[in-house]
Amino acid sequence: MEDYVKIEKIGEGTYGVVYKGRHKSTGQVVAMKKIRLESEEEGVPSTAVREVSLLQELKHPNVVRLLDVLMQESRLYLIFEFLSMDLKKYLDSIPSGQYMDPMLVKSYLYQILEGIYFCHRRRVLHRDLKPQNLLIDNKGVIKLADFGLARAFGVPVRVYTHEVVTLWYRAPEVLLGSPRYSTPVDVWSTGTIFAELATKKPLFHGDSEIDQLFRIFRTLGTPNNDVWPDVESLPDYKNTFPKWMEGSLSSMVKNLDKNGLDLLAKMLIYNPPKRISAREAMTHPYFDDLDKSTLPAACINGV
């Protein structure tokens, strides 16, 4: 820790306080995340340190770089590259009655998918994607923060400040208590974020797990074994759930064209193996008119 100096507190992350800091000798500005864990008496589990150290290998223009993992007494500090703006703040800053430029929506979504595909190829899930951990710079680049932390530290029900962790972007298989889930959970979250990029409003904003599920069901219909094999045997599925018919996604997400709505629907398919993958989504016709050569990952993809 002696290599870094804290400048100011910049927020409360899922796992602890986040500071803006500076590397003493290079002057590089960084984000310093102090990890507080439930079982702090025993210190940080070595498994968590191992897991999180592996994340230093995730080097991609659309993934926030983990620069260093430091221990101080029983505290763990994660040192990340610094970006000053997140997607939630940016969406909140757009004046009432105005919306994000449709081409920027497309560019951001494509870049998010690039980052997710990169991590998924390396068998790293996010599990907690939301606008607050999508960071943006002033050049149109968007980066995913906190990739892999859920596996290292778990996803807490509450932030350490007792603020409830948002459920708005959580996939239905997670909400229904599936013991096994995989990369499709991140695609679902990205779909809900896609809708929010277009409308500035969360697509499904539940205030409890059951309210969250019912908001999804009201729009997409209550799932059963016909549309999602074995859903009825998931731990938190109840046969007493109200049986809603499928509603209209297009009436809720008015700012997307036909291709955009088609891609969104494919990202919000109930049955996880049938849900479009990040890689497949990147080849969807919605992106045909996006100039991918200007995107930050173009150089590594040989676009």
Swiss-Prot record:
Q: Which gene encodes it?
A: cdk1
A Gene Ontology biological process in which this protein takes part is: mitotic G2 DNA damage checkpoint signaling
* Annotated ATP binding sites: 10-18, 33
What InterPro entries does the entry give? CDK (IPR050108), Kinase-like_dom_sf (IPR011009), Prot_kinase_dom (IPR000719), Protein_kinase_ATP_BS (IPR017441), Ser/Thr_kinase_AS (IPR008271)
Q: Does the keyword Kinase apply?
A: yes
Q: What class of enzyme is it?
A: transferase
Organism of provenance: Oryzias javanicus (Javanese ricefish)
**Which positions does the record annotate as the modified residue Phosphotyrosine?**
15
Subunit structure of this chain's protein: Forms a stable but non-covalent complex with cyclin B in mature oocytes.
Q: Which domain of life is it from?
A: Eukaryota
Question: Its function?
Answer: Plays a key role in the control of the eukaryotic cell cycle by modulating the centrosome cycle as well as mitotic onset; promotes G2-M transition via association with multiple interphase cyclins. During G2 and early mitosis, CDC25A/B/C-mediated dephosphorylation activates CDK1/cyclin complexes which phosphorylate several substrates that trigger at least centrosome separation, Golgi dynamics, nuclear envelope breakdown and chromosome condensation.
Protein name, per record:
Cyclin-dependent kinase 1
Q: Which UniProt keywords apply?
A: ATP-binding, Cell cycle, Cell division, Cytoplasm, Cytoskeleton, Kinase, Mitosis, Nucleotide-binding, Nucleus, Phosphoprotein, Serine/threonine-protein kinase, Transferase
EC identifiers of the protein: 2.7.11.22, 2.7.11.23
Q: Name one GO cellular component term.
A: centrosome
Q: Indicate where this protein resides in the cell.
A: Nucleus; Cytoplasm, Cytoskeleton, Microtubule organizing center, Centrosome
What GO molecular-function term can you cite, just one? Answer: ATP binding
For this protein, what post-translational modification is recorded in UniProt? Phosphorylation at Tyr-15 by wee1 and wee2 inhibits the protein kinase activity and acts negative regulator of entry into mitosis (G2 to M transition).
Q: Which PANTHER family match?
A: CELL DIVISION PROTEIN KINASE, CYCLIN-DEPENDENT KINASE 1
Family, according to the entry, reads as follows: Belongs to the protein kinase superfamily. CMGC Ser/Thr protein kinase family. CDC2/CDKX subfamily.
Q: Reaction catalysed?
A: L-seryl-[protein] + ATP = O-phospho-L-seryl-[protein] + ADP + H(+); L-threonyl-[protein] + ATP = O-phospho-L-threonyl-[protein] + ADP + H(+); [DNA-directed RNA polymerase] + ATP = phospho-[DNA-directed RNA polymerase] + ADP + H(+)
Transmembrane feature ranges: none
- Residues at the catalytic site: 128 (proton acceptor)
